[in-house]
Amino acid sequence: MDGTDVTMLMREIGVRARAAAAELAFAEPSRKEEALNAAAEAMLARSDEILEANGRDLAFGAEKGLTPAMMDRLKLDAARIDGIVEGLRAVAGQPDPVGQVIAEWDRPSGLHIRRVRTPLGVVGVIYESRPNVTADAGALCLKSGNAVILRGGSESFHSSGAIHAALQDGLRQAGLPVDAIQRVPTRDRAAVAEMLRMVEHIDVIVPRGGKGLVGLVQAEARVPVFAHLEGICHVYADGDADLEKARRVVLNAKTRRTGICGSAECLLIDRAFLAKHGPVLIEDLLKAGVEVRAEGELAQVPGTVPAQPEDFGREFLDMIIAAKVVDGVDEAIAHIRRYGSSHTESILTENDATAERFFRRLDSAILMRNASTQFADGGEFGMGAEIGIATGKMHARGPVGAEQLTSFKYLVTGDGTIRA
């Protein structure tokens, strides 16, 4: 496909998306719910087709030499399809954000003012190897009254296509425009460049992928962007941490799934914790098969690898973690401010004052206490699913669910009211 063809294709998709968004903005909540539940049923009915398509993508990924972490992101099985189905149903059951009254008040002039949620319009989602993003993004945009243009990575091309077909089955059954959820039907990377320039047709871009993709989008987009560059998540074991809680959380935060943005990439151990309990957290990680890149006295623990300066502030997305000792919560905070990506940080402590200091003095999108960073997920936050984790400070922040995909407008009612 040459450049002219891609430009024309993307313009056509954009025009259709804008028309669908205009209709979707006032669709009844019951019809959107029906479409999502029908899409969930279609996903189950098409599960063999989806798995066959995923097999083709996995073969393609193996040929390209994808890392184990990327292959894990790409892989679908019956359990993961069930998870997608549950996510669709959960989004269907969420309150519809469109039209919700955020605030209302009366003015001395006699005006009654309401601020109500309204769709953004058209959302463009650019993602890499996770085919489940097709379902999550499609569902959340539909729930929030937005049309969406999906551009999945070349690795997940067939899987995303099969999932997209199920989403459109749901739209048809509910009598909603199938153009409300469109997928870019080409692997040509020129389509991404076109999306980033489509200011007339797309209201916001959400990139979902690695640092290279997100950095490219942020650098070149003319359309506003919701994004995070990396998930450099920290776990800090305070001197007042409960040992057994700390052991459970650290292992889970690193090893449950290493290829997700909520995986812990750096462990900070308070010197007081080390004095009480020794290097037990490091030993647990080593026994679990994690490569621990340790600094200072932690590098003396047998089996660790000496940390290099570049290991701090690095997203490994693998069975690797950086580790160092800190003198108190303030040094932990300083380290996170320097090396973190404003994604998710967790403090392990039984001391309320220390936890409050950690929460008040850090400004990451998600801050946790005595909980695994792997909970940094819209589904775990009760959103049903997420379109991504936003770490910026404008508009959406943290897990981006249906509510975060809305703006607002003011509805002002008078009674022949005029301004003096």
UniProtKB/Swiss-Prot annotation:
Main location: cytoplasm
Pfam families: Aldedh (PF00171)
CDD domains: ALDH_F18-19_ProA-GPR (cd07079)
Record key words, sorted: Amino-acid biosynthesis, Cytoplasm, NADP, Oxidoreductase, Proline biosynthesis
Domain of life, per lineage: Bacteria
GO MF annotation: an example: NADP binding
Reaction(s) the record says it catalyses: L-glutamate 5-semialdehyde + phosphate + NADP(+) = L-glutamyl 5-phosphate + NADPH + H(+)
Any one of the GO BP annotations: L-proline biosynthetic process
InterPro entries reported for this sequence: Ald_DH/histidinol_DH, Ald_DH_C, Ald_DH_N, Aldehyde_DH_dom, G-glutamylP_reductase_CS, Glu-5-SA_DH, GPR_dom
Subcellular location: Cytoplasm
Keyword hit for NADP: yes
HAMAP family for this protein: ProA
PANTHER family recorded: DELTA-1-PYRROLINE-5-CARBOXYLATE SYNTHASE, GLUTAMATE SEMIALDEHYDE DEHYDROGENASE
Protein name (Swiss-Prot/TrEMBL): Gamma-glutamyl phosphate reductase
Organism this protein belongs to: Cereibacter sphaeroides (strain ATCC 17029 / ATH 2.4.9) (Rhodobacter sphaeroides)
